[in-house]
Curated annotation (Swiss-Prot):
Substrate binds at K45, N69, S70, M71, G72, L73, N128, N194, S195. This is Putative dihydroorotate dehydrogenase A (fumarate). Pathway: Pyrimidine metabolism; UMP biosynthesis via de novo pathway. PANTHER family: DIHYDROOROTATE DEHYDROGENASE (FUMARATE), DIHYDROOROTATE DEHYDROGENASE (QUINONE), MITOCHONDRIAL-RELATED. It comes from the Bacteria. Keywords: Cytoplasm, Flavoprotein, FMN, Oxidoreductase, Pyrimidine biosynthesis. Belongs to the dihydroorotate dehydrogenase family. Type 1 subfamily. Homodimer. The gene is pyrD. The lineage of its organism: Bacteria, Bacillati, Bacillota, Bacilli, Lactobacillales.
């Protein structure tokens, strides 16, 4: 029997597919739609210390090859999502979940994570170090010194399962430098990648979105090659205890298969989920299992990370 079951840290999942933060996760109702689908889990909207309305609209647009957005981290505040995942966990009848959070300063991040430490929530936390769409706030994980200092401080007080959402890296030396930092800490996972920041899409001589004069994060087909490169680069560099979540350009079982082949333990779907809805998880799971059967693979472990190189 072909299985797409997987594991992140000490958490087991009966499937390897889930939503990406930012899609179908703003409200409890949206999260429950993902919960009731064939997705293995859900990740919440990235929660900040306070409620945020986000950037002015229009701030999202579908494009021929994917999407562009400058949402600006709209969310209901981290406590809204923390309370929700905590309540679900207490029932004992739900899947393990991911709580996505970030502060707009190191102090805010510390306040949020200490509140999670003090809570009943024992699930996974995804710290978003890679949002490209908050005006005046750089993507933290591009600053290696700041990232190192932030993680060093976090792990002086935070002992629950924690992973980080990364921006895409484009230089081999940056993979080396980033991995050297991440390997110093007890991270449960890294998520590769967030959208490629500050793209520009034009139609009829005009930009598609309003914030930042049309500059926004690019998702969908555009970013799959970059996402696969990041997944594989970190798979080859990170210690085995740090699992990898692959995100970027996934809309078919073949896409998911390639992320796992590059080293991903789980795969998140963003743009295609926004376009197709939670039914996508059933379709992509079936397509992935079909590929596995054709190739004689019974489990993800049979091919994870087994990308072949040219002689």
């Amino acid at each position: 029997m072909v299985s797409t079951a997987t594991q992140i840290g000490h958490f087991s999942f009966d499937n390897c597919l889930m939503n990406a933060a930012g899609v179908y996760c703003m409200t409890k109702e949206e999260l429950m739609e993902v919960e009731k689908s064939q997705a293995a889990s859900f990740v919440t909207k990235t929660g900040t210390l306070e409620v945020r309305p986000g950037n002015p609209e229009p701030r999202y647009a579908d494009t021929r090859l994917g999407s562009i957005n400058s949402m600006g981290l709209p969310n209901n505040g981290f406590r809204y999502y923390l309370d929700f995942v905590s309540d679900l966990a207490k029932t004992g009848q739900h899947k393990p979940h991911f709580l996505s959070v970030v502060g707009l300063s190191p102090t805010e991040t510390e306040t949020i994570l200490k509140a999670i430490m003090a809570s009943d929530y024992e699930g996974l936390v995804e710290l978003n170090l890679s949002c490209p769409n908050v005006p005046g706030k750089p993507q933290i994980a591009y600053d290696f010194e700041t990232t190192d200092q932030l993680l060093e401080n976090i792990f002086t007080y935070y002992t629950k399962p924690l992973g980080i959402k990364l921006p895409p890296y484009f230089d081999i030396v940056h993979f080396d430098q980033a991995a050297a930092i991440f390997n110093k800490y007890p991270l449960s996972f890294v998520n590769c990648v967030n959208s490629i920041g500050n793209g520009l899409v034009i139609k009829d001589e005009q930009v598609l979105i309003k914030p930042k004069n049309g500059f926004g994060g690019i998702g969908g087909d555009y970013i799959k090659p970059t996402a696969l490169a990041n997944v594989h680069a970190f798979y080859k560099r990170l210690k085995p205890s740090i699992h990898i979540i692959g995100t970027g350009g996934v809309k078919t079982g073949r896409d998911a298969f390639e992320h796992i082949l590059c080293g991903a333990s789980m795969v998140q779907i963003g743009t295609a989920l926004h376009q197709e809805g939670p039914a996508i998880f059933e379709r992509v799971t079936k397509e992935l299992k079909t590929i596995m059967v054709e190739k004689g693979y019974q489990s993800l472990d049979d091919f994870r990370g087994n990308l072949r190189y040219k002689d």
